[in-house]
């Protein structure tokens, strides 16, 4: 029932070339591209400074970085000749569309798996096809053969069930607004405990009975204990992403089977229609509870509870990001750092522009010198560690080894640039620019430095998708089942397309459920009789 949420902020990856030995030290780095307009300047500079090999170190070219999500390269913004700037709205929209399309498959796979588990269970275990016990929220059991009586009974049951859903949703929002996190966590843990232990045990028992597999009670209890404990840890604490996603898919499928089992036939269809309307109101209404939940979580910069949300994303953690205040505090506490960079932006500028690197610090002020040059010909980084040291007979050795003069003239420039890149990739570099981010595993000790990417889909959406397909599968018509399956995926794809265009939380149920209901009844009423008639008359199209 929760809304789909897209965060299409792509983290920048550190780039490097791969045509030298130094490049092998840079793991998983992207490839640098040199702008064509710098080629002539670089050649002129190298030819005019053959007698001064150390001076070529300062001519660091502009860096073109390629985003890891597949977007266009964007130039780092820097002083003194950096021509790059922030991306335009057109590029941002293009990146968002590409990013959303990239994650469609990542969302199709879990939705398809959840529906396949439900369909396979419905067709193999007869326990979930028969309905002899009903939920407490459905007092009208549709025992009458009259269609009108069934219709009003289904309508009344759906209204009662939706009233319970609305009350529970508003209760959850009130608790979240009041920061009653312990109550919410206890509520979710109790629900997960019942699903992972009690309902899973019932599912295992019926599965063993259906396939006539003998198992003693101690073994079954041991399996259930291990399965439930690992699931509780991965959902509510920490665990591998794939494991958490697998448990969420299983929980959604199990809950869908419960609805199929204990809801009357007509009530199930009425609930699907009613829940789609409620999802539309709850997400798009200005005072909708799900919209309030999403906006409050964004304002507080908090995660929505993992037991309610399926996320297709991995965690992109920021490594050693230094704020300007921290840099100034470091500079003021250490006398030896008076000549080092005091802001991350100045460090970025020194790496992005050759004009800024060749200057003596006048473009950014005297308080932000970029590098220190020693008498022995080496250039010091901002931390005081030499980037590279050159010997006086470097070019002579290169010519003796058979290298061309052009290669020797550009050697110092390439080595200096790669040394800068290697030093920037080191995790202990405290002066790293805040524009540099690397894809790492999530750091549990620094949760504040994490940011999320990808698509999020509420578990309620998984549940009701599976209820629709499972209910269609219970009639034994594979044509209707496949039609509902395709309709749900088409509706989900349209929802993701609108999500990438509008860039706000959208309800995931209305389009998919509407398409599914239309395809289900149209296929069972029109397509199935038509195909049976063609098959009886041996007409092949």
From Swiss-Prot:
Motif (PAL): 507-509
UniProt entry keywords in alphabetical sequence: Endoplasmic reticulum, Glycoprotein, Golgi apparatus, Hydrolase, Membrane, Notch signaling pathway, Protease, Transmembrane, Transmembrane helix
Tissue: Maternally expressed in nurse and follicle cells. In early embryos, expressed in all or most cells and later increases in CNS and epidermal tissues. In larvae, expression is seen in all imaginal disks, brain and optic lobes. In pupae, expression is seen in eye disk and brain.
Subcellular location: Endoplasmic reticulum membrane; Golgi apparatus membrane
Region ranges (Disordered): 1-52, 69-92, 327-379, 421-449
Alphabetized Pfam families for the sequence: Presenilin
Record-linked InterPro entries: Peptidase_A22A (IPR001108), Preselin/SPP (IPR006639), Presenilin_C (IPR042524)
Role noted for this protein: Probable catalytic subunit of the gamma-secretase complex, an endoprotease complex that catalyzes the intramembrane cleavage of integral membrane proteins such as Notch receptor. Required for S3 cleavage of Notch, which releases activated Notch protein from the cell membrane. Involved in the patterning of the optic lobes.
Entry protein name: Presenilin homolog
Organism: Drosophila melanogaster (Fruit fly)
Organism ancestry: Eukaryota, Metazoa, Ecdysozoa, Arthropoda, Hexapoda
């Amino acid at each position: 029932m929760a809304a789909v949420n897209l965060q299409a902020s792509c983290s920048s990856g550190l780039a490097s070339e791969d045509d030298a030995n130094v490049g092998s030290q840079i793991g998983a780095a992207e490839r640098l591209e040199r702008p064509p307009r710098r080629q002539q300047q670089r050649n002129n500079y190298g030819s005019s400074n053959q007698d001064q090999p150390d001076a070529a170190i300062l001519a660091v070219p502009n860096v073109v970085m390629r985003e890891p999500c597949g977007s266009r390269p964007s130039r780092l913004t820097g002083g003194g000749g950096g021509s790059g700037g922030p991306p335009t709205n057109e590029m941002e929209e293009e990146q968002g569309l590409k990013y959303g399309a990239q994650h469609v498959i990542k969302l199709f796979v879990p939705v398809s798996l959840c529906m396949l588990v439900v369909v396979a269970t419905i067709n193999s275990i007869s326990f979930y096809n028969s309905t002899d016990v009903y939920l407490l929220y459905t007092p009208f059991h549709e025992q009458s053969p009259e269609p009108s009586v069934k219709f009003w009974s289904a309508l009344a049951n759906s209204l009662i069930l939706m009233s319970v859903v609305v009350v529970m949703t508003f209760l959850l929002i009130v608790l979240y607004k009041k920061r009653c996190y312990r109550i919410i966590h206890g509520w979710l843990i109790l629900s997960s405990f019942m699903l992972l232990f009690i309902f899973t045990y019932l599912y295992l028992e019926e599965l063993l009975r259906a396939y006539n597999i003998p198992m003693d009670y101690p073994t079954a209890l041991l399996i259930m204990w291990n399965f439930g404990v690992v699931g509780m840890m991965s959902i509510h604490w920490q665990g591998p992403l794939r494991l958490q996603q697998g448990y969420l898919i299983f929980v959604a499928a199990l809950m869908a089977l419960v609805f199929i089992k204990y809801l009357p036939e007509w009530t199930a269809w009425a609930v699907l229609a009613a829940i789609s309307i409620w999802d539309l109101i709850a997400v798009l209404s200005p005072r909708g509870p799900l919209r309030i939940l999403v906006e409050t979580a964004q304002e507080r910069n908090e995660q929505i509870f993992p037991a309610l949300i399926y996320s297709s994303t991995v965690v992109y953690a920021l490594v050693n990001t230094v704020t300007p205040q921290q840099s100034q505090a470091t500079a003021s506490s250490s006398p030896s750092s008076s000549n080092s960079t005091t802001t991350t932006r100045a460090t970025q500028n020194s790496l992005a522009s050759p004009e800024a690197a060749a200057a003596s610090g006048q473009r950014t002020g005297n308080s932000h010198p970029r590098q220190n040059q020693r008498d022995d010909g080496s250039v010091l980084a901002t931390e005081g560690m030499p980037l590279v040291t050159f010997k006086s007979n470097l070019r002579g050795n290169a010519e003796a080894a058979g290298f061309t003069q052009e290669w020797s003239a550009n050697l110092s420039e390439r080595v200096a640039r790669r040394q800068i890149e290697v030093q920037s990739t080191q995790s202990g570099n405290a002066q790293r620019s805040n524009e540099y981010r690397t894809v790492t595993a999530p750091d549990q000790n620094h949760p504040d430095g994490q940011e999320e990417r990808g698509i999020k889909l509420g578990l309620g959406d998984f549940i009701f998708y599976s209820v629709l397909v499972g209910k269609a599968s219970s009639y034994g018509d594979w044509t209707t089942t496949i039609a509902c399956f395709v309709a749900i995926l088409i509706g989900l794809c349209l929802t993701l397309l609108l999500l990438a265009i509008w860039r706000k939380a959208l309800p995931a149920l209305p389009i998919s459920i509407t398409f599914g209901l239309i395809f289900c009844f149209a296929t069972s009423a029109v397509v199935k009789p038509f195909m049976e008639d063609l098959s009886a008359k041996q007409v092949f199209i």
